[in-house]
Structures are given as structure tokens and as C-alpha cells.
Design a protein with these regions (language model features):
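N-terminal beta1-alpha1-beta2 module of alpha/beta enzyme domains
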Residues: 36-118
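An alpha-helical appendage that flanks or caps ligand/catalytic pockets
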Residues: 48, 172-200, 240-348, 374-377
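Short, well-ordered coil/turn segments that N-cap beta-strands
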Residues: 48-50, 85-87, 115-120, 146-150, ...
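Flexible, glycine-rich active-site loops centered on histidine and acidic residues
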Residues: 50-66, 128-190, 230, 238
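Conserved, mostly hydrophobic/aromatic
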Residues: 52, 111, 142, 223, ...
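Hydrophobic faces of well-ordered beta-strands that scaffold small-molecule active sites
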Residues: 52-56, 88-90, 120-122, 150-154, ...
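Active-site mouth loops of central-metabolism enzymes
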Residues: 58-70, 127-132, 208-213, 324-329
């Protein structure tokens, strides 16, 4: 679709509604395919058919370096492909020693080159950090290299701290231009018009599927107005999950990309042989969230036996509030948790974060999740 002026209409209409309710947004984010993209492996609840995908945080641990984290992410994708997961996404984070996916498009290429069928994408690119034209070039190039396998999730959060924003040359008003920037990316990925003077080569015509990522009502309204799939970051910001999904579905306007609402829900799932073992593994993630509030983000830490000795009551309340939508336990517990979440949200797809310290143990968690959900080959 070439740019024919409709973007200006969409932008004006979107702003009229979005400016009425625009809380601050911050997400790491997440997410999937279009309605024409068939799902052959599903979680079955009474009324829903839900695909499973993975958000890989590309964690650098106390026992691995950045190269190890990147290779581990690729290895997760290889196994996920065999186990029936729909897609794997990585996210843009800057100046974080424990996350190695800052150059998100490069990491996507690394993962896609090691796999054959699983979709690979950004969950997401923090678009105000970049020129839309450059993002279109990057993801259009990925789409030429890996046809039919690339997703582009877009968010407007910084993905870093205020000091690093200055190094990124991000301006204070950049987030305000997010709706227009999304339209620009979409236009550059569309087939170029005959009189179009600026073309994103080789991206023009690739029409890489776009996703709107969010953790508030703002993203839900924008995704609905533009007719794009919506991924909610409930794996760390669960409070507005249900209201945001309701807003998105009620206001959705069909588009050339999508003819019906499509929702992805982020969820932390850690599976092990027993509930007790899964809870022990989950302490790695609990410590990571605690460290966010302490301002001491660092490398991923190995699990501990007594999490109560690590955090204060206030820190526990803060961390567990962010982790409220987590499913931790044995395969039976995981099955029940997934079934309940799907029934409550009607999610078309779940984006699974399994933040386990040891690589082999994390693979086992993903395998148990796939088996419990009934998607494993």
C-alpha cells in the first residue's frame, strides 16, 4: 500500500481520541501473525484457540557473556521451532548489562539465520529512538532475507534511562510523534508509488506485519484506530490488561493488514517438575524486578532458596505487583494457569517469558510449557 493521504486522516482521527486519554506508557513488550496466518498448534480452552510464542530477554548471566546470551537466544528459537511455538521476539533495551538485545534487528537476523520456519521479530522496537525510514530499511532487509517470517512490534517507551536517551539523541517530544511515525514505517514498507521520490530500498513492498505494543490504554486505542494487532505487556505491567483489551476490541477498525481484532498477552511462565522447584527457579526473576526498584540492574542472578531474605516487604509488594500475571509451577499448574488466562482474556496468542537462569533448565521450562499446553510435536 503506497502512501495516498489516508495516513493524515488516520493521524488526525487518532489524535482526537488519544489525546483524551494518554497516560504514560512504558513497556518491554511483545508479539504475531495476521488473521490470514493459520494457527495449526493451539492451546484449547472452552471457547478459544490460542497460539504460544516466546519473548526472549537475551539475558546475560553471571555465568555467561553477551555472546553466550545471543547464542542461547538462537538455541531457544531452534528448540521452540521444534516444539510448536509460533514466533520468538526480542526487545530493544539500552545500557542494561544484563540484556544483550540492544541492536534488535541484528539479533533478529542472528536468530532467523539459525531457524527455518518460526517467525522472528521485535517485541519491540522503541520507535521514538529511531528514524522511521531507517527502521523500515532494516526490517525490510530482514524480510528480503527471511521472507514471510519477520514481525515488527512498535512501542514508544524509551527502553532505557534518561541519561542514555541523550546518547540516543532522542528528543523529549519524540514520543508525541509515535502515531505519525508508525504510519511512516507502514508507508515505507508498502509498495512504492510511481511518483514516490523517497523509497526505502529494499524494504518497499515487503509489507512487514506491524504490531502495536503497550501497557496502557493509549496503545490499545492507537492499535484499534490503525487496525493493527495489539500486544499487551502484562508480563510486567498487568494492571490495565483487561480494560486495554476491551478498549481495543470495541474500537477496532478493519484495515488492509487486519480484518478483525487480534490480541497478544504477555505472561511470565516458569515450569518445572514440581511447584516447589518452579518457585525456586522464579527467584531469579523476582530478584531482577527487585533490583529495578533498587536502581541496581545488573547481570541475571542464579536462583536462591529463600527469596524472603533478599527483599523487604515493600520490595516484595512492588515486584509481585508487576509479576501478578505469572504462572509458576508443575505442568499441571501451568496448564491450569494458561487455561484460566485464556478464558479470562480471550487472547489470540500468549507471548511467554520464561526468565530462568540456567540455559538448559530454561529450555526444559519451555518444553514443559509446550507439552502442558498441548502444542508440542
Amino acid at each position: 500500500m503506497s502512501h495516498d493521504g489516508r495516513g493524515d486522516f488516520y493521524l488526525a482521527s487518532a489524535y482526537l481520541e488519544l489525546e483524551k486519554e494518554k497516560p504514560p506508557i512504558s513497556f518491554i513488550a511483545i508479539w504475531p501473525p495476521l488473521s490470514s496466518d493459520p494457527f495449526t498448534r493451539v492451546v484449547r480452552s472452552e471457547s478459544f484457540m490460542t497460539a504460544l510464542s516466546i519473548l526472549d530477554l537475551v539475558r546475560v548471566t553471571e555465568d555467561t557473556d553477551a555472546r553466550g546470551a545471543l547464542d542461547n537466544a538462537r538455541d531457544v528459537a531452534v528448540h521452540a521451532e521444534a516444539w510448536g511455538y509460533r514466533r520468538i521476539w526480542v526487545a530493544e533495551h539500552h545500557n542494561m548489562p544484563g540484556i544483550a538485545s540492544a541492536a534488535t534487528s541484528v539479533v533478529i537476523g542472528h536468530i532467523a539465520a539459525g531457524t527455518k520456519t518460526i517467525r522472528v521479530g521485535a517485541g519491540g522496537i522503541m520507535l521514538p529512538n529511531h528514524a522511521p525510514y531507517v527502521i523500515a530499511e532494516q526490517f525490510g532487509t530482514l524480510a528480503r532475507l527471511f521472507p514471510g517470517r519477520i514481525d515488527l512490534g512498535l512501542g514508544r517507551a524509551p527502553g532505557t534511562d534518561q541519561l542514555t536517551l541523550r546518547a540516543l539523541r532522542r528528543t523529549p517530544e519524540a514520543a508525541e510523534n509515535f502515531p505519525q511515525d508508525v504510519l511512516e514505517v507502514q508507508a515505507f514498507l508498502a509498495p512504492a508509488g510511481p511518483n514516490q521520490r523517497i523509497r526505502a530500498v529494499p524494504a518497499a513492498g515487503t509489507e512487514v506485519p506491524l504490531w502495536i505494543l503497550g501497557s496502557s490504554n493509549f496503545g490499545a486505542m492507537l492499535a484499534a484506530k490503525l487496525g493493527l494487532p495489539y500486544a499487551f505487556a502484562s508480563h510486567f505491567a498487568p494492571e490495565l490488561l483487561i480494560p486495554a483489551l476491551q478498549i481495543y476490541r470495541s474500537r477496532f477498525e478493519p484495515s488492509e493488514q487486519l480484518d478483525r481484532p487480534y490480541t497478544m498477552v504477555g505472561v511470565n511462565i516458569i515450569a518445572a517438575g514440581s511447584d516447589d522447584e518452579a518457585r525456586r527457579l522464579a527467584t531469579t526473576q523476582q530478584m531482577s524486578f527487585t533490583n529495578i526498584f533498587r536502581g541496581t540492574r545488573g547481570l541475571s542472578q542464579p536462583p536462591i532458596n529463600d527469596i524472603e531474605s533478599y527483599w523487604s516487604p515493600v520490595e516484595k509488594a512492588q515486584a509481585m505487583g508487576m509479576l501478578a500475571r505469572s504462572i509458576v509451577g508443575s505442568p499441571a499448574t501451568v496448564f491450569s494457569g494458561i487455561d484460566t488466562l485464556v478464558a479470562e482474556t480471550g487472547a489470540d496468542e500468549l507471548m511467554v517469558v520464561s526468565d530462568v537462569y540456567d540455559h538448559a533448565t530454561r529450555l526444559r521450562s519451555f518444553e514443559l510449557i509446550a507439552s502442558a499446553a498441548g502444542i508440542a510435536s
